[in-house]
Amino acid sequence: MSIPGLEHWLETAQGRYVREWESASMDNAIADVFGFNALQLGLPQCDFLRASRIPLRQKAAEAGTVDVLCELAALPFASHSTDLVVLPHALEFSADAHQILREVERILIPEGHLIILGFNPISLWGLRNRFDRSGSFPWHGAYLSLTRLKDWLKLLGFEVDRGIPGCHVPPCDQEAWLKRWHFMETAGGRWWGFPGGIYLLHAIKRTHAMRLITPNWRKNAVGSKALRPVAQKEGHGR
């Protein structure tokens, strides 16, 4: 899956602004996640595993310079083999976002971590996404709301650990305007009453323990003994 316009956008003032927030937020999110295998799916131009303490860190995507070239909806990794999966903007630019999540659930170990970066449709960025007809990145994506994404994750057995909003500055194209509106980033959504244009969602794959019901042999033994016929003593008449 090659995303048209992505390379150019990453080098714009807007792209650099988003990358800066996402990189810092991801560094904090994965710093205390431990294990043996970490995987970044998509957006190989950015290293979102740079702060991970996990020894084996790989990038996988459908195009670009990566460790593994593959379809994100059919991952070539064994089930229950990965401790951490990072999904930076892979869902909103995929034709089968739900299948990607199913594959992620399959390869994650129980209690494994999933961290998603996405554009928020309920924001100023989402408003531009709705009305921008240029077809350029990132305005042509199918943004996923947090409510919908949480529902999908719940159905797959994930528990949302935390969500972090970011990029409260309006989606201006010029760096001068991004700097002029930067005071909104500092205040965040606490003062302005609307969420940020980007979210980071951290979820954990939960495996609920099954209760194994075994036969109560003691009870059955007592029951069978109680039902056992007792030999009758026969009296002898004189």
Give the label of every model feature segment.
Residues 24, 28-75:
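Class I SAM-dependent methyltransferase SAM/SAH-binding core
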Residues 73-85:
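A short acidic, Gly/Pro-enriched loop at the edge of an enzyme's catalytic core
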Residues 83-98:
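A short SAM/SAH-binding and catalytic strip from SAM-dependent methyltransferases
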Residues 98-113:
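A short glycine-rich, Lys/Arg-flanked "PGG" loop and its adjoining helix->strand segment in the class I
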Residues 113-143:
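Conserved class I S-adenosyl-L-methionine
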Residues 131, 140-163:
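Short alpha-helix
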Residues 160-185, 194-195:
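Conserved catalytic loop of SAM-dependent methyltransferase domains
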Residues 183-238:
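C-terminal lobe and adjacent flexible extensions of AdoMet/dcAdoMet transferase-like proteins
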